[in-house]
């Protein structure tokens, strides 16, 4: 103590040479038999598991764990996402593991939302769509039963002050080629009012100060609008099947 002031709520610690025993527990890991494939390993448990442990193989020096997917037999939607800051369609085309590992998820629908980063590189519409088309074809080649939906870029400005005509051209090409290339389209640029609505969207609190990225409310609004459009299309699909 440096003074005789002891205030309410404080803890006084007195050093002592005494010791206190602590109980320890030993965990035993039971290896599971994996079903290997070229780019993944699967394990199906007959009973529900509440925990698993990942233990490195001591016999292998170099290895990579690219992902872990936990599933059950309950009905519902299984949603996966991949988002890399600054990513463009050309980036996904560079790394073959993206297409090689995607079948592990057995996707029914793959949604692609790219374009804003390409616009800051000032990619021409033709260059952008060539890269996008390569990405789509790579996905379909490895996942022939999966549907592909391309989402256009939301409204944005270039370098805080210029009209982003690049994403407008990208949206045109995405819509014009949808039927020929056999993919679905959701025009977020149009649904969000186009580039002329940037001031209005910003006033609503949907956009960040750079007028490129969106706020939490803005991204949630995009998700809400997409979900409504998706369900509406699904209900229309069901009605035509009856």
Model-predicted regions and their roles:
Residues 106-119, 126-142, 147-190, 219:
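Conserved N-terminal glycine/acidic-rich loop preference
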Residues 97, 131-135, 225:
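Well-ordered alpha-helical segments embedded in enzymatic catalytic cores
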Residues 1-130, 213:
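Conserved SGNH/GDSL esterase-like catalytic core that processes O-acyl groups on lipids
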């Amino acid at each position: 103590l440096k003074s005789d002031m002891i205030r309410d709520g404080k803890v006084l610690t007195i050093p002592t040479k005494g010791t206190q025993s602590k109980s320890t527990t030993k965990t035993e890991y039971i290896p599971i038999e994996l079903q290997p494939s070229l780019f993944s390993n699967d394990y199906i448990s007959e009973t529900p598991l509440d925990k698993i442990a990942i233990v490195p193989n001591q016999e292998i020096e170099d290895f990579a764990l690219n992902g872990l997917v936990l599933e059950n037999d309950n009905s519902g939607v299984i949603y996966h996402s991949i988002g890399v800051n600054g990513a463009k369609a050309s980036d996904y085309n560079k790394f073959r593991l993206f297409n090689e590992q995607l079948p592990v998820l057995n996707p029914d629908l793959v949604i692609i939302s790219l374009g804003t980063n390409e616009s800051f590189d000032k990619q021409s519409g033709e260059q952008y769509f060539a890269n996008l088309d390569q990405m789509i074809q790579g996905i379909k080649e490895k996942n022939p039963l999966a549907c592909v939906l391309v989402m256009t870029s939301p409204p944005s400005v270039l370098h805080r002050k210029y009209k982003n005509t690049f994403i407008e051209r990208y949206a045109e090409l995405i819509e014009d080629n949808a039927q020929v290339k056999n993919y679905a389209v959701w025009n977020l640029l149009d649904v969000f009012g186009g580039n002329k609505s940037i001031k209005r969207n910003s006033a609503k609190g949907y956009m960040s100060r750079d007028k490129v990225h969106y706020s939490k409310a803005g991204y949630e609004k995009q998700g809400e609008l997409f979900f409504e459009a998706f369900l509406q299309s699904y209900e229309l699909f069901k009605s035509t099947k009856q």
